[in-house]
Each structure stands twice: as structure tokens, then as C-alpha cells.
Design a protein with these regions (language model features):
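Bacterial N-terminal signal peptides that target proteins for export
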Residues: 1-8
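N-terminus-centered regions that define maturation/targeting leaders and the start
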Residues: 19-143
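Bacterial N-terminal signal peptides
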Residues: 9-17
């Protein structure tokens, strides 16, 4: 019984260390970016990307890599985009050309969790800062 407990603890450590290392890639010194956004009706399903407000964006930023994830459906790809020669604190609505917005099922009367992940890149493409912002929404929010 004790052996199973130790194996379980080792497995948890490996899982957690994997989560930590994948958040900022290989650049452990990356800073933290604040990420905020609001989903509107026009951002749903295959609409346009929402405006995204960033704080603490490093002055050395030369580009951004942005992706949208659905925490309730990890395999779902909601796209995002790469913004080259970009270092502004506001990503305008519609700027993410690969965006496929959240499209919660009308038959499920619950809320879903969506995360925008933003990586700031320097002139060499190295990640110099990372941030993410989460919102929850359901179909009823957009009727």
C-alpha cells in the first residue's frame, strides 16, 4: 500500500513539473503579462477576435503569439494569431486572423472556461514575457 502511495506522489510531481515547464517554454526568466478581454456576441463561434488589453508588456517586445484555449475541451483549437512588429498594449478587435471563437453548445446549460495565452517575443523570436487571462461564459450570455 505504501508503495502505491509513493508511486502516486511521483506521478503527480512529474505531471506538475510538466505543466510548469510548458507555460513559458524554455525561457525561465520570462516576465508576466496581464491579459484582459471581454467576449461579446460578435466574438462567438467564427466571429472576430475580441479586443485584448495587455499590461506589463516589456519594452523590448517585437511581436506577440496569441492563442485561445477551451479548458473544458482541451482538444478544441480556437486558433489565435502571430502579430509581428507589434508592441502595443491593446490588441484591436479582429486582429487575430486565425481566431475561432468559443461556441458553447445551446443544449448544455453550463458555463465554459476560455483562456487567452499571450507570449511576448523579442527580435529573435525568444519569449520574453508570458501571460494568460481566463473568462467563463455560456450560450445564455450571448442571446
Amino acid at each position: 500500500m505504501k508503495r502505491k502511495s509513493i508511486l502516486f506522489q511521483v506521478a503527480i510531481i512529474f505531471l506538475l513539473s510538466g505543466c510548469v515547464s510548458t507555460q513559458v517554454g524554455s525561457n525561465i526568466d520570462a516576465g508576466t503579462i496581464g491579459v484582459d478581454f471581454v467576449f461579446q456576441k460578435e466574438n462567438m463561434c467564427f466571429g472576430t477576435s475580441p479586443q485584448i488589453t495587455l499590461t506589463h508588456l516589456p519594452a523590448e517586445t517585437k511581436g506577440l503569439k496569441v492563442s485561445l484555449r477551451d479548458l473544458d475541451h482541451p482538444g478544441a483549437d480556437h486558433g489565435g494569431g502571430d502579430l509581428k512588429n507589434f508592441n502595443a498594449s491593446i490588441i484591436p478587435a479582429g486582429a487575430l486572423k486565425g481566431y475561432q471563437g468559443p461556441c458553447p453548445s445551446m443544449s448544455e446549460h453550463r458555463r465554459f472556461h476560455y483562456v487567452f495565452k499571450v507570449e511576448a517575443l523579442d527580435e529573435t523570436g525568444k519569449v520574453i514575457a508570458f501571460g494568460q487571462g481566463m473568462k467563463e461564459c455560456g450560450w445564455v450570455d450571448f442571446q
